[in-house]
């Protein structure tokens, strides 16, 4: 199951910076985190699903790059997001 539109809208609503925000780093990182958490659970039960594992690793790398960008540009927003999502940094 991919991220359904209702769940995606909830995430966007929680992390948006302004009214029509869908592409800020915070929103992108939050959506990726939700997808990563889902895929992690999926891979615990389907250990041989290598296609999904590769997709998971790509998402983790993309999230890492977005987090590095946010940390480089605005450290306060980075710290707030990391604590809200419960990520290690």
Swiss-Prot record:
SMART domains: Ribosomal_S15. It comes from the Bacteria. Keywords: Ribonucleoprotein, Ribosomal protein, RNA-binding, rRNA-binding. InterPro entries: Ribosomal_uS15, Ribosomal_uS15_bac-type, uS15_NS1_RNA-bd_sf. GO terms for cellular component: cytosolic small ribosomal subunit. GO terms for molecular function: rRNA binding; structural constituent of ribosome. Pfam families: Ribosomal_S15 (PF00312). GO terms for biological process: translation. The keyword RNA-binding applies. Belongs to the universal ribosomal protein uS15 family. Part of the 30S ribosomal subunit. Forms a bridge to the 50S subunit in the 70S ribosome, contacting the 23S rRNA. One of the primary rRNA binding proteins, it binds directly to 16S rRNA where it helps nucleate assembly of the platform of the 30S subunit by binding and bridging several RNA helices of the 16S rRNA. Forms an intersubunit bridge (bridge B4) with the 23S rRNA of the 50S subunit in the ribosome. HAMAP family: Ribosomal_uS15_B. This is Small ribosomal subunit protein uS15. It comes from Heliobacterium modesticaldum (strain ATCC 51547 / Ice1). The gene is rpsO.
